[in-house]
């Protein structure tokens, strides 16, 4: 008896899920904020971040730890 009841319940669940999916497919939903402005917000945020990094890297005057090769001369070795 248990397998029969289990099978009946699983079929009921599957049918209810299928009905819910069918209702959602046929239902016309209005576009939300992300549908309307999602790509524009993403593009403007990426542009802003790139602009800030470019400004910071070129205009602020941060010393970016360049290589000392060719600019540093070694001192003479002193033996004691």
Swiss-Prot record:
Location in or out of the cell: Mitochondrion inner membrane
Disulfide bridge positions per record: none
Residues on Mitochondrial matrix side: 25-32
GO biological process assignments: central nervous system development; mitochondrial electron transport, cytochrome c to oxygen
Membrane topology of this protein: Single-pass membrane protein
Transmembrane parts of this sequence: 33-59
UniProt-recorded name of the protein: Cytochrome c oxidase subunit 7B, mitochondrial
Organism expressing this protein natively: Bos taurus
